[in-house]
Amino acid sequence: MIETTKGGSGSYPIKTIVVLVQENRSFDHTLGWFKELNREIDGVTKSDPKSNTVSSSDTNSLRVVFGDQSQYVNPDPGHSIQDIYEQVFGKPWDSGKPDPNPGHPNMSGFAQNAERNKKGMSSAVMNGFKPNALPVYKELVQNFAICDRWFASVPASTQPNRLYVHSATSHGATSNDKKLLLEGFPQKTIFESLDEAGFSFGIYYQFPPSTLFYRNLRKLKYLTHFHQYGIQFKKDCKEGKLPNYVVVEQRWFDLLSTPANDDHPSHDVSEGQKLVKEVYEALRSSPQWNEILFIITYDEHGGFYDHVPTPVDGVPNPDGILGPPPYNFEFNRLGVRVPTFFISPWIEPGTVIHGPNGPYPRSQYEHSSIPATVKTIFKLKDFLSKRDSWAGTFESVITRDSPRQDCPETLSTPIKLRGTMAKENAQLSEFQEDLVIMAAGLKGDYKNEELIHKLCKETCVADASKYVTNAFEKFLEESRKARDRGCDENDIVYCVDDDDDHVVIPPQSHSEASNAAAQPKTQTSFFNKLFSCFIRHD
């Protein structure tokens, strides 16, 4: 049972903020063509075509015009920090010595980078969805608000950007940092700030939650804040028991029985549309509806084209930590623009939010705007980093004196865009590898380099999904045992092996804890360990 939510959020009518962060789609790719529905949107039109050449240094090379033919996208475009550098600045990343001052972000390298990664991919990268292809978003655009100046926090891949959503920093990560994935990222999060102030939060997961990237959320005291989405979310909505801060986590692995609904290519975005529809309708029918602000955004652009230059001036490093060599990224520029929705009965239909009015002259909307706005609405004491103190806040989207009574109760049924079945034998994406590494840390396999490597590089989606699920279930089981034995609520359970053994450790690194941990009784081979995990899960 979630504790009773706390009111008292001052002059704001919002007592519950719900956050859903989808995967890897740019603004133009997703909502650019929605300008035909609302001319206020900074999108794209046939009368003012946007384009890239396949060679940004040769103006006579093939020019690819941004189109409106997106449907099912496969494969996954490049979106590493190196790829994004080329997409944004129009010149390839120099692996020996990348330019720390690359100049104006002319957004001219998307087609070039796509062709460099795979011949013919520029067609997928330089296309967006027609509004009718995304019927759920079409209705949300017409009935609520979108922001057309929201940027990814880092010009990098999924995991660093997701870290900013709840902590306003990636703690120096620009891609998957295995050590930190195993140990958990140590920075303070908005979850702790809320908890310290007496507000409640809940994480509703459909697959082992990525919020366990944060080390502090692995503490025993936060176990009761994690809920199975399919069992608890609609129930809590119906009973009016949603906490003050709600995070909905998706299905990250594309399986035949449960297709991925995170919108990550090559997943079918119609599954993501179904998820948004389901979450919205549950919130809309809740007795808490008139106190809810629902935010949908995307972690990063996924390599897809966007025409708005990324901000490169005045962006503060959140905590003074630099990225890894050889670039030593200073976290002083943002990523590519991504779609963002604000949904509440306190918002006028068809609202378009552009850039923020402060708190600084060059402030922008980015993922750190979420904890910054949570701080504002709930009057929390401190910022998490220099980044959320700089980021624009969006409480001003609440403009009405009374809640609307005409918000749609249901949304349209999505259109299936993929003509094939889920590919369970596919290789893992980088983010799926991140989840596997995190799971190895939870399960106690952190020292088994061979196991981790094979899980990430030689295991298919279906088998990796089983491993992650098994690891999470083991972590929960051992954590519950430790809690029942009266262990300190600030401790973190450290699973030792495939037996029922565990040790409870304070918040310190796995490397420190390993000296005190019980060693496995037998050395299990990769295939036997994997097999035994799967049999136990099934």
Curated annotation (Swiss-Prot):
MF (Gene Ontology): phosphatidylcholine phospholipase C activity; phospholipase C activity
Tissue occurrence: Expressed in root tips, cotyledons, on leaf margins, stems, young anthers and funiculus.
GO cellular component: plasma membrane
Stretch list, region Disordered: 91-112
Keywords per UniProt: Cell membrane, Hydrolase, Membrane, Stress response
Annotated function: Non-specific phospholipase C (PLC) which assumes major PLC activity during inorganic phosphate starvation. Substrate preference is phosphatidylcholine (PC), but can also hydrolyze phosphatidylethanolamine (PE) with lower efficiency. Has no activity toward phosphatidic acid (PA). Plays an important role in the supply of both inorganic phosphate and diacylglycerol from membrane-localized phospholipids during phosphate deprivation. May be required for lipid-derived signaling molecules that positively modulate abscisic acid (ABA) response and promote plant tolerance to drought and salt stresses.
Enzyme class per UniProt: hydrolase
A Pfam short name: Phosphoesterase
Coiled coil stretches, renumbered: none
Membrane topology: Peripheral membrane protein
E.C. number(s) listed in UniProt: 3.1.4.3
Subcellular location: Cell membrane
Stated name of the protein: Non-specific phospholipase C4
Gene that this polypeptide is encoded by: NPC4
Family under the similarity heading: Belongs to the bacterial phospholipase C family.
Disulfide bond sites: none
Induction (UniProt): Induced by auxin, zeatin, salt and inorganic phosphate deprivation.
Catalytic activities: a 1,2-diacyl-sn-glycero-3-phosphocholine + H2O = phosphocholine + a 1,2-diacyl-sn-glycerol + H(+)
Observed effect of gene inactivation: No visible phenotype under normal growth conditions, but mutant plants display decreased ABA sensitivity in seed germination, root elongation, and stomatal movement and have decreased tolerance to high salinity and water deficiency. Root hair elongation defects under low inorganic phosphate conditions.
SUPFAM superfamilies attached to this UniProt entry: Alkaline phosphatase-like (SSF53649)
GO biological process: phospholipid catabolic process
